[in-house]
């Protein structure tokens, strides 16, 4: 995976699945030691950008934002845009923050630079889309797979919604900086990738039972990204250079696949719906946010056991029962996934995240309504299996939260 852009173009360009594949608009990806220092100024100069708004929060400003401004001193004028935290201490991609960021970007800026992790990138990609100018990605932690995608999960009127905006024109990932990321941020990135276990199964189920568009090549690329993380989990856990490089490559590859498809289907299923629901509830109650990848990882660990427990369930629909067996019997069990996540230093249950059991039950009942997607999460509600899962009625076995 030395040249991710060419690899994705070649693999998906040869695909004959019949679904729409969009052009890959990311021009450059640089992952390596001193990638920002050595390659960002040259890229800005070659593109003839004159005025860059560098967007960051208090923490990422110290880590990268101010350094970027210094690096570009002789190349372009830079304007800092500091994102403020809310009362709970989080920077969130809600209306207030989005408008504040847009106001902070000078009208004559011709490029934006996102210096941060997932939320900052979502805010910047929205601003770039609204202003009609490109943005450059400078990740400060290997924590999410959305760096190179066009989808921006935003909080609009208190509800989590993914808005298709724009992908970065380029990404520069400094391995020295990424290796210094806190362990919980690294574990969050691994958790976001672990979510592909259930999201890929959900995509296949939706193909079989709901006739949703499906691309085998995109599924295969996402699976490769997941497998690469699993193969290097010990190196990732130790934050070794090669391990962090492979984690970052995997996150970027997943994002590029989403970009070409113009949707997040291979990377986001029931586990993301649960995560988004819990995030919305935290905002409602003015609570500090839990890292996205931590919630996704815990959701995937729980859902894989739920999905496996559906095998053999009597649904009164032979086709659905056969599809469930063919897809879900290939899933690893939650105990094995928890071992992987624990090795990286991440949480394996919602109890560890201080999420109340009753809220998890509520999420299992309602999170599938957030997106019009067919998932195993929707199946358990469609066929009335949730009470049995929660030990409150007949049906499949209970599940550990």
Curated annotation (Swiss-Prot):
GO molecular function annotations of the record: glycerol-1-phosphate dehydrogenase (NAD+) activity; glycerol-1-phosphate dehydrogenase (NADP+) activity; metal ion binding
Principal EC category: oxidoreductase
EC assignment: 1.1.1.261
Protein localization: Cytoplasm
Top-level lineage group: Bacteria
Catalytic reaction list: sn-glycerol 1-phosphate + NAD(+) = dihydroxyacetone phosphate + NADH + H(+); sn-glycerol 1-phosphate + NADP(+) = dihydroxyacetone phosphate + NADPH + H(+)
Predominant location: cytoplasm
Cofactor(s) needed for function: Ni(2+)
HAMAP family, alphabetized: G1P_dehydrogenase_B
Protein name as annotated: Glycerol-1-phosphate dehydrogenase [NAD(P)+]
Organism: Bacillus licheniformis (strain ATCC 14580 / DSM 13 / JCM 2505 / CCUG 7422 / NBRC 12200 / NCIMB 9375 / NCTC 10341 / NRRL NRS-1264 / Gibson 46)
Organism ancestry: Bacteria, Bacillati, Bacillota, Bacilli, Bacillales
Gene: egsA
């Amino acid at each position: 995976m030395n040249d991710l852009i060419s690899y994705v173009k070649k693999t998906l360009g040869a695909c004959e699945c019949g679904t729409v594949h969009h052009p890959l608009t990311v021009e450059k990806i640089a992952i390596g030691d001193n990638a920002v220092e050595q390659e960002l100024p040259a890229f800005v100069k070659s593109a003839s950008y004159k005025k860059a708004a560098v967007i960051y929060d208090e923490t990422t400003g110290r880590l990268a934002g101010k350094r970027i401004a210094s690096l570009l001193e002789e190349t372009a004028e830079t304007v800092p845009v500091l994102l403020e935290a809310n009362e709970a201490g989080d920077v969130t991609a809600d209306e207030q923050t989005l408008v504040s960021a847009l106001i902070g970007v000078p009208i004559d800026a011709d490029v934006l630079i996102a210096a941060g992790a997932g939320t900052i990138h979502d805010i910047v990609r929205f601003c770039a889309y609204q202003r009609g100018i490109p943005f450059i990605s400078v990740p400060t932690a290997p924590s999410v797979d959305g760096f190179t995608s066009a989808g921006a999960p935003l909080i609009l009127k208190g509800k989590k919604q993914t808005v298709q905006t724009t992908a970065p024109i380029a990404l520069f990932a400094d391995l020295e900086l990424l290796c210094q990321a806190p362990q919980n941020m690294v574990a969050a990135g691994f958790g976001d990738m672990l979510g592909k276990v259930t999201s890929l199964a959900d995509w296949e189920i939706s193909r079989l039972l709901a006739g949703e568009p499906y691309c085998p090549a995109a599924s295969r690329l996402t699976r490769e990204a997941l497998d690469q993380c699993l193969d290097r989990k010990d190196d990732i856990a130790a934050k070794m250079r090669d391990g962090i490089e492979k984690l970052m490559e995997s996150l970027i590859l997943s994002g590029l696949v989403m970009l070409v498809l113009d949707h997040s289907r291979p990377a986001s299923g029931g586990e993301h719906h649960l995560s988004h629901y819990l995030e919305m509830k935290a905002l409602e109650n003015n609570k500090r946010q839990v890292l996205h990848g931590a919630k996704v990882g815990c959701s995937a660990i729980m859902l894989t056991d739920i999905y496996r427990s559906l095998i053999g369930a009597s649904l009164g629909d032979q086709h659905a029962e056969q599809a469930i067996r063919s897809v879900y019997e290939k899933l690893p069990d939650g105990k094995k996934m928890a071992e992987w996540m624990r090795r990286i230093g991440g949480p394996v249950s919602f109890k560890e995240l201080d999420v109340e059991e009753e809220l998890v039950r509520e999420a299992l009942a309602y999170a599938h309504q957030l997106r019009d997607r067919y998932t195993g999460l929707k199946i358990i509600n469609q066929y009335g299996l949730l009470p049995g899962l929660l030990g409150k009625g007949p049906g499949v076995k209970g599940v550990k939260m």
